[in-house]
Amino acid sequence: MKFLTLALSATATAMIIVNPEQQPLAPSIVQNPQHKSLIELAPYRTRWVTEEEKWSLKLDGVNFIDVTDEYQSGSYGTLHTTRVVHYPGAMEHAHEILPLTETLDKSNMRSNLEHFTSFYTRYYKSQTGIESATWLFDQVTAAVHESGASDHGATVERFAHPWGQFSIIARIPGQTDNTVILGSHQDSINLFLPSILAAPGADDDGSGTVTILEALRALLRSETIAHGQARNTIEFHWYSAEEGGLLGSQAVYANYKKNQRNVKAMLQQDMTGYVQGTLDAGEKESVGVIIDYVDQGLTAFIKEVITTYCDVPYVETKCGYACSDHASASRYGYPSAFVIESQFENSDKRIHTTEDKIEYLSFDHMLQHAKMSLAFAYELAFAPF
């Protein structure tokens, strides 16, 4: 996530539409200065910055996408349109999903998060960032193998990046190539000195990482899913380098667009564990459904998922441009949505510091996000796109 830190702060049609937040054409860009990155602060509003200027912007709560690779490849400014996808108007698989939600285990999430935050930092350019990714890859691989899904075509892939820390993609094939994706980001950062200071990243985004890992484990308890008998393909993504400007997820979705991957829905889970800010504001526990820079049809569907399967309500909230990896999916023409732990203004202010620790998180609240993730994946696994 990119915002102010502590103290500094249902058949797809052939119709094509343009994301309402997108602008028509990119302006000209000043030639690349040496050792700088090109960032996009709003649609087609760019600036060349140093690495230090990147972190300064993040400390000031400024969102951005690092589009340097797009610029260097000559593809920056390409307008990727989004196909309209019709999502189910009602939940149709409660009989199968509710027993699966009973298998979600908070103790799994806690033990996984305790280990994940034990790495000194998961900064995407660090050695421990590679080590944490390797550990996570092993957990995802074990979940897939233990379910028997790998005997039916399920795979776990390391998606390589030039900075070292790789992204992780678990793919559970269905009967079609229509693909439903749940995402989180695995990297962490300490914005004061990213290469030196500790960054436990418990909430941002260790919480989302273990939330969708637990949803994957529960989902694969369905023999129908694990044996590849669902209508659609399901993927779980753990992106590298979100904190550097959505670098990992951009690379993934650029690859998917190049290879004409048929993505019907993408849901991001970034920060799922902090509820105290909501309670301190005198409000009831809820989850925050992002309503800006997202696909409105998919967002409406997710509201129905929450209402049906979660024990807490949702509230609508906004997080601005490029606030997490769902923006990369949208950028490449794939419908995406994002649900966060609370109203945006009540979310965790300890992120990007040494104080982003487990002790401040609620695993009961994370369980609500896991229920939502599980139900989202199962319902759309059988949607007649």
UniProtKB/Swiss-Prot annotation:
Keyword Protease appears in the UniProt entry: yes
Alphabetic keyword roster: Aminopeptidase, Disulfide bond, Hydrolase, Metal-binding, Protease, Secreted, Signal, Zinc, Zymogen
GO cellular component, one term: extracellular region
Prodomain positions: 15-85
Free-text remark on how the cofactor is bound: Binds 2 Zn(2+) ions per subunit.
Cofactors named for this entry: Zn(2+)
Sequence positions that bind Zn(2+) 1: H185, D204, D270
A GO BP entry: proteolysis
GO MF annotation list: aminopeptidase activity; metal ion binding; metalloexopeptidase activity
Enzyme Commission designation: 3.4.11.-
Transmembrane segments: none
Pfam families associated with the record: Peptidase_M28 (PF04389)
Signal peptide positions on this chain: 1-14
Gene3D superfamilies noted in UniProt: Zn peptidases
Disulphide-bonded residues: C319-C323
Location relative to the cell: Secreted
Principal location: secreted
Family statement: Belongs to the peptidase M28 family. M28E subfamily.
Known role: Extracellular aminopeptidase that allows assimilation of proteinaceous substrates.
Protein name from the UniProt record: Leucine aminopeptidase 1
Organism (species): Penicillium rubens (strain ATCC 28089 / DSM 1075 / NRRL 1951 / Wisconsin 54-1255)
